[in-house]
Amino acid sequence: MARRPLVMGNWKLNGSKAFTKALIEDLKTELAGVEGCDVAIAPPVMYLAEAEAALKCSCSCGGKAIALGAQNVDVNVQGAFTGDISTEMLKDFGAKYIIIGHSERRTYHKESDEFIAKKFAALKQAGLVPVLCIGESEAENEAGKTEEVCARQIDAVLNTLGAEAFNGAVIAYEPIWAIGTGKSATPAQAQAVHAFIRGHIAKKDNAVAEQVIIQYGGSVNDANAAELFTQPDIDGALVGGASLKAPAFAVIVKAAAKAKN
């Protein structure tokens, strides 16, 4: 089946109120008239209000529809959980695509596969779209454990929620050794892992596997995106540094739209 690509910008710990408004205005200009690719951005949670307002203005002025996302969520809806953000709070700002399982969260905040699966469940229950990040470290890659690691991270969801939980969800394969390093998996390497991920889900439910969006992340930029998107199982990208520059991000979006339509 034809899958509509999704390119999402993960701004990480970057930006300001002024930066958020300016970048969205620039994206509106750069992406004018681009069809065939869904686009989302995940600014820091402090700037969701500015982003929501700027995106509403963009749509009302006939600009490209850009969805709002977030970089994290907690499993609790409310209560004594200092510093956490709930699904309902994110919905209140119009956020749709929520990143979970990013290697920076797994590493710096010691988030386990099991905890990430609980976040996945919370997002599905709230009607939001999980963007589940998976991927291996450089040591695991060199030891030939890429598929083993990816399978384990996916199984945390599969074995608790079932394959149907991936209906309407997004997976982002981000090899840790390629994130922010300037290194990137070759298109063939990335395709092999994406095909494995889809095949792993297909063992449980082929129909779900065929429709799930699998993005590539890990030093995706305006120079390598087009070649990555020629691969049949790469359905877009989760973009880090390049998403902070409207022209570079727009090149990636346009490359996805061209390759998949």
From Swiss-Prot:
Reactions that this protein is recorded to catalyse: D-glyceraldehyde 3-phosphate = dihydroxyacetone phosphate
CDD domains the UniProt entry points to: TIM
Family from the record: Belongs to the triosephosphate isomerase family.
EC category name: isomerase
Enzyme Commission code: 5.3.1.1
Entry-linked InterPro entries: Aldolase_TIM, TIM_sf, TrioseP_Isoase_bac/euk, Triosephosphate_isomerase, Triosephosphate_isomerase_AS
Subcellular location: Cytoplasm
UniProt KW keywords: Cytoplasm, Gluconeogenesis, Glycolysis, Isomerase
SUPFAM superfamilies with a match to the protein in the record: Triosephosphate isomerase (TIM)
An annotated Gene Ontology molecular function: triose-phosphate isomerase activity
Biological or metabolic pathway of the protein: Carbohydrate biosynthesis; gluconeogenesis; Carbohydrate degradation; glycolysis; D-glyceraldehyde 3-phosphate from glycerone phosphate: step 1/1
Gene Ontology CC: one annotated term: cytosol
Gene3D superfamilies xref list: Aldolase class I
Broad class of the protein's primary localization: cytoplasm
Self-association and partners: Homodimer.
PROSITE patterns, alphabetized: TIM_1, TIM_2
Role noted for this protein: Involved in the gluconeogenesis. Catalyzes stereospecifically the conversion of dihydroxyacetone phosphate (DHAP) to D-glyceraldehyde-3-phosphate (G3P).
Gene Ontology annotations of biological process type: gluconeogenesis; glyceraldehyde-3-phosphate biosynthetic process; glycerol catabolic process; glycolytic process
Active site, per annotation: 102, 174
Name of the featured protein: Triosephosphate isomerase
Entry binding sites for substrate: 10-12, 180, 219, 240-241
UniProt keyword annotation of Cytoplasm present: yes
Highest rank taxon of the organism: Bacteria
